[in-house]
Amino acid sequence: MSKIIGIDLGTTNSCVSVLEGGEPKVIPNPEGNRTTPSVVAFKNGERQVGEVAKRQSVTNPNTIISIKSKMGTAEKVTVEDKDYTPQEVSAMILQYLKGYAEDYLGEKVTKAVITVPAYFNDAQRQATKDAGKIAGLEVERIINEPTAAALAYGLDKQDQDQKVLVFDLGGGTFDVSILELGDGVFEVLATAGDNKLGGDDFDDAIIEYLVAEFKKENGIDLSKDKMAMQRLKDAAEKAKKDLSGVTSTQISLPFITAGEAGPLHLEISLTRAKFDEITLPLVNRTVGPVRQALSDAGLSTSEIDQVILVGGSTRIPAVQEAVRKETNKEPHRGVNPDEVVAMGAAVQGGVLTGDVKDVVLLDVTPLSLGIETMGGVFTKLIDRNTTIPTSKSQVFSTAADNQPAVDIHVLQGERSMAADNKTLGRFQLADIPPAPRGVPQIEVTFDIDKNGIVSVKAKDLGTNKEQTIVIQSDSGLSEAEIERMVKDAEANADADAKRKEEADLRNEADQLVFQVDKTITDLGEQITEDEKKSVEDARDELKKALEAGELEGIKAAKEKLEGVLQPLVMKVYEQAAAAAQAAQGGEADAGAGKKDDGVVDADFEEVKDDK
């Protein structure tokens, strides 16, 4: 069976892992790094992903970052006059991860386990699955990030019974999950979180502080300057990372903007104490979900055996201190917070292929599910923290006499009124036979599958007529849209390959043009006027083809020039060999050896000159 890769599709960075010899292994990207920035950029119609996209983000306005925060929404990103859904942009990142995983494994990859924040709702989970499909991946399972982390942590500790609290603060989302581990069973007891809290918010707090300080000193508001804000974003992220290791850092941005008197520079020293002060409200927001999860699990902090920190933002000292204070535990430091989620996803992939035996994962739904009933009330059918997969039915009736149809409004959330919760979708059960209100029996059934994705069925028990929908939210993509995006993604992959082929061909052609001039110089008077004219004409033809930029034309001109140049190159080699033989005064065999040496030396010389 082909391998199932594990992907942590993060807000700031993504990571891909695979199970090798029963152990999860992180696959490095082409630059050799173990995580890849979740950044996509467009330049002159060309698409860039990862490190290269992030490096030029300051100067390229067509750069997309933190797209994960838009997953499950109908919001689109417009770049170079084209609209992209969050699913399409995420698919570009997934396609890149898939590509270098294939290079590493030496085989095609078609299946993946992708992680999502535990607090992702149905629309966000469905969007993630769609992104995988667009990228050419069969998403075998969507699993929660804290659960994946616990899976990687507990794989070699199956002989121990323990209760684990996973504190996951990533680039854009925050989750807390409490799990019970024992005898190969990983059971989630409770989960809580905040989908609008992460490392990006800590960066924004620093940016706000820098903008305010600069305005105070120079009277100029940098928040209106797009380029300055991008430079501030990079500087804030770097300062945040620095302050995890040192108590003070210097933020220096020369020529950040221009005033009446000329260019202005930003020079500010940021201490860890100041950073802690401006980010205190964010740190405090992590406390509520921790308490909520403990309460839902029916546990006190003394009953927690281990606290695992996940996500790059847990490196912030104030965050670690808040965790210590709230749990009365020293966090476990045996896992890499940036990689453990992808590794857990790879373990889950191994469970699905049968490579990992005797592991059972019992996850939960993070939010309650129900429907709107009379008076705009939210009636729950499945409570939050219910183990999935699950199914639940309840019988409802009509609100008016002779009501011909029932509108089913499906919601997810914890508030008592429907309007305050997240709408997952609406559908209608029609053709109900005329009857007084309260008489028809309408059975509504909720199903949540192993990926946390919801489907709902309504059935008229009198007529046995039923209507089923897999929830399709406003942001959901139809099969036709997904199919179109899959084709676009494949076309882009082909276009990228074609661009690479074109670049390689151009380089070879440029090298050949240079070689012509060098060969003419090396031969000096040994070359006849006819030979010289013939090779120069072929060279000029190739130069014109390069300017025209037509691939087939370049190929044809290059082949023609190679044919004309070959005899002249042989002349140069023979000349060099003869000169070497004369100098050595050697025998014929030795001369032949020198001729070989000449070939190698000339080859090396040319490559050096080209560089």
UniProtKB/Swiss-Prot annotation:
**Coiled coil, from the record:** none
Annotated spans, Disordered: 577-611
Specify the inducers.
By stress conditions e.g. heat shock.
Q: Does the keyword Nucleotide-binding apply?
A: yes
For bias type Acidic residues, the affected ranges are 599-611
Q: Which UniProt keywords apply?
A: ATP-binding, Chaperone, Nucleotide-binding, Phosphoprotein, Stress response
Q: Which molecular-function annotation in GO is an example for this chain?
A: ATP binding
Q: Which PROSITE patterns match?
A: HSP70_1, HSP70_2, HSP70_3
Q: Which domain of life is it from?
A: Bacteria
Q: Which residues carry this modification: Phosphothreonine?
A: 173
> Matching Pfam families, A to Z?
HSP70
Q: Which family does it belong to?
A: Belongs to the heat shock protein 70 family.
Return the HAMAP family for the record: DnaK (MF_00332)
Name-wise, this protein is Chaperone protein DnaK
Q: Which organism is it from?
A: Lysinibacillus sphaericus (strain C3-41)
